[in-house]
């Protein structure tokens, strides 16, 4: 129960700090709807494996894990935004609330796409030869793959 409560509080924090500063009426509503969907999908990443159909389980897990990555980036972006606003406050800089609120979902979305692309690419293979002194003759030429 604690993890879901913490997840709910963090979603509420993001919504409370970002949504009111978004322009128009549709943008904040869309952002809050996305947060509600995120709150529903993240547990699906962990509960998806309980599905009897493997394809269904994979879909729920994919959706949940992708949403978890986006949520993580949203949280970090929101915290960084709050830090920027806090540091800018004493200097009476031009209003930063609206532009930084727009930057939060944009940065989070781009970072999530970058992370997804990096996770889906084929890993490079590196061949490294390491000489080990005192190695028994039976192990000469032995290959370790990691």
Feature roles, as predicted:
Residues 1-123:
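Non-catalytic terminal accessory segments
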Residues 120-126, 131-146:
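Membrane-embedded segments
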């Amino acid at each position: 129960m604690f993890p879901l409560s913490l997840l709910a509080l963090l979603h509420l924090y993001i919504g409370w700090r970002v949504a009111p500063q978004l322009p128009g009426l549709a943008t904040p509503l869309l952002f809050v709807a996305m947060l509600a969907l995120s709150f529903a999908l993240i547990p699906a990443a962990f509960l998806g494996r309980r599905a009897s159909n493997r394809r269904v389980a994979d879909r729920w897990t994919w959706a949940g894990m992708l949403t978890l990555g986006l949520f993580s980036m949203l949280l970090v972006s929101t915290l960084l935004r709050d830090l920027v606003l806090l540091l800018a406050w004493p200097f009476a800089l031009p209003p930063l609330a609206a532009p930084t609120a727009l930057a939060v979902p944009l940065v989070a979305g781009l970072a999530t796409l970058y992370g997804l692309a990096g996770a889906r690419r084929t890993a490079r293979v590196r061949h490294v030869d390491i000489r080990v002194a005192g190695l028994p003759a039976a192990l000469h030429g032995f290959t370790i793959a990691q």
